[in-house]
């Protein structure tokens, strides 16, 4: 017999409507932000260190923020050196980076642009991002907190490191299979993937992804890797144009984050220092190691990837030399290079570099 039938009448106290609304709203917000946990206490100290007369006790074990890349357990080794030293950017060069867009000129460009727009829609949905129209930045539904920005950065960079690795891998195998040189493409593509991974590792020093974010990254990376792999086999030119358009969106994202920081919408980042891994990788000078400086460096990298991939998309994939890995006869003229001194928003045309 059901045990409920043996008990007396149960009287349920009415729950006030305003309390129910508060409970539902709080639960919804907590689930939406469950994908990320801060690993830097100052970011959340002011938000949650409210004085109360209660002592909250929980039997749930507290998660410990682990270091995603601790130093190697090797007493004889001081540091692991990288094969790709990052070029030094000046503050003037980084501030000169602008949002830009290359117009689609053929069916290949339109396929790439449409794919990026679809990917952008999915990324916005997962990260809760809504891009405001000009003049609507102060509307509440468009405002982003520090935690929400970090969630978007982590998701974006975990996916952005895929194209360079896939392209470099396929070109490496093609070079071995055909027993011919690759003309400098492999190194540039692998270096791009490494750079995007350094972006991710830097942001992971500031926040630890939760189970929801890990699941989303796993699914997105699995689908994106295989899709890009097959697409690169079919049309490398379209894939490079796709990455160029994707980096346009990345520049737009970081530009808005910088504007939010400069306008005072992200108060916890105003005096936040960049992680040590970022200081060493970008060779950040003394006095220019804040969160704002970090975002300027990352945006400059994304702008460089935008230029590189739009340029590679303009070349003949099987025969042309990678213009970012060569020594020019006349260095006094503007040419493609590893730095951002002569950065071109829409890439270099083939006639300019071949």
UniProtKB/Swiss-Prot annotation:
Alphabetized, the UniProt keywords read:
Electron transport, Iron, Membrane, Metal-binding, Mitochondrion, Mitochondrion inner membrane, Oxidoreductase, Respiratory chain, Transit peptide, Transmembrane, Transmembrane helix, Transport
EC number per UniProt: 1.-.-.-
Task: Give the enzyme class.
Answer: oxidoreductase
**UniProt membrane topology term:** Multi-pass membrane protein
Instruction: Quote the transit peptide annotation as a residue range.
Output: 1-64
Which is an annotated GO molecular function term of this record?
metal ion binding
Protein name (Swiss-Prot/TrEMBL): Alternative oxidase, mitochondrial
Provenance organism: Emericella nidulans (strain FGSC A4 / ATCC 38163 / CBS 112.46 / NRRL 194 / M139) (Aspergillus nidulans)
User: Which gene produces this protein?
Assistant: alxA
